[in-house]
Each structure stands twice: as C-alpha cells, then as structure tokens.
Amino acid sequence: MPLNAGLPVMFDREFGFLNRLLVAPLRSRSSIVLASVIYITALSLLQSLAIMGTAAVLGYGWPGISGLALVLVTLLLLVFAVTALSLGLAFALPGHIELIAVIFVANLPLLFASTALAPLSFMPTWLGWLAALNPLTFAIEPIRAAYQGPLDLSAVLLEAPYGDVTGTSCLLILLVLTIGLFLAIRPLLNRKLS
C-alpha cells in the first residue's frame, strides 16, 4: 500500500485538482503532502493490525505488548520510508504510467530479494548479499523476532554476509532511511508545490 501512495497525488496532478489545492489559502502547502502521508500511514497500520488479528484468531500467535510496540514502530518507519519514496517519485516522474511502471518493477524484486520468504542461510551468496542490503529485510527481522518470543533488541537478528545485525541496528537503519528519504524529497516537494 505505501508504495502506491504517490498514485493519488499523481492523478490529482494530472487532472488539475492539485493546482486547485495549491491556489487555495492554505497555511502551508506541505500540508497537502503531510495529509497524504498521515492517511497512508493510518490505513497501512490498520490493515496490518487486521492481518495480525486474523493471524492470532487462526492460531498463529500474537506478539505480546512489547512485541506489538516493536511491530508498530517497525511498520511505522517502513511505511514512512516507502511513502516518502513514492511521493517523491510522484512529483519527479511526468505521469502515472511511469509511476506505475516503477512501482511494478520495484515491488516484486523488493519482496523476493528480502528475508520475507526465506532466511539468508537458504539463499545463494549473491542473493544473500542483496537481501542483507534490502531495507525490507531490516523491517522483517524485528517483526519476526517480536513473534518468536522474549523481545531482546540487542540480540542478533540477521547474520548478514558483512556482519551481525541486531534489532536496534535494524530500527536505526530504518530510521536513517526514513529521514534520508524525507530530506531527499523535500527540495523536490518545495519546488513542485511553490
């Protein structure tokens, strides 16, 4: 869902609705983007909670209070990062066809080149390196750890080819990625919204 966050903005841009918003007497034009980020984040977290609740009812377990907090923080960071990327692409690319193409080209490789479907130890060396550098892996491993038992963020969650990665490191990497993406798209948003 967050990877598609830029599509509504792109359609608003193409059909002229965004121009109408830009001439409205808003206190801050960045509130247009902020509203989109808040909406996508809330929707993604609700969908995730619904999936987690359904999994718990079906007998797959519940992460507990501290585990739930870790899952929500991890999802929040991931959703913010992917939403920032999608919104940046929505303002950088000329039309929705290009945006949809980028989304489709990025979506499945991000999933398959991560630890979502198989642990690193099952992967060939080259794929293990890709998965160990994939931001999605840094979100999957803390969530997996939250479901596996007692929560310890200092424990090694990922035995990457370049070294061991702890739960705290995963969250810090996601935080740096999120902040970096928002800082990277900020000049573009300022230019396009002014």
Model-found features: residue ranges?
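Long, hydrophobic alpha-helical segments
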Residues: 1-8
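Short amphipathic alpha-helical coupling elements at transmembrane boundaries
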Residues: 16-23, 91-94, 128-132, 141, ...
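Short cytosolic juxtamembrane segments of multi-pass membrane proteins
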Residues: 187-194
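Transmembrane helix segments
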Residues: 90-137
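Short, membrane-exposed interhelical loops at transmembrane-helix boundaries
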Residues: 137-166
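Alpha-helical transmembrane segments and their short interhelical loops
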Residues: 28-29, 33-104, 163-186
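Helix-loop-helix units of permease transmembrane domains in multi-pass membrane transporters
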Residues: 8-39
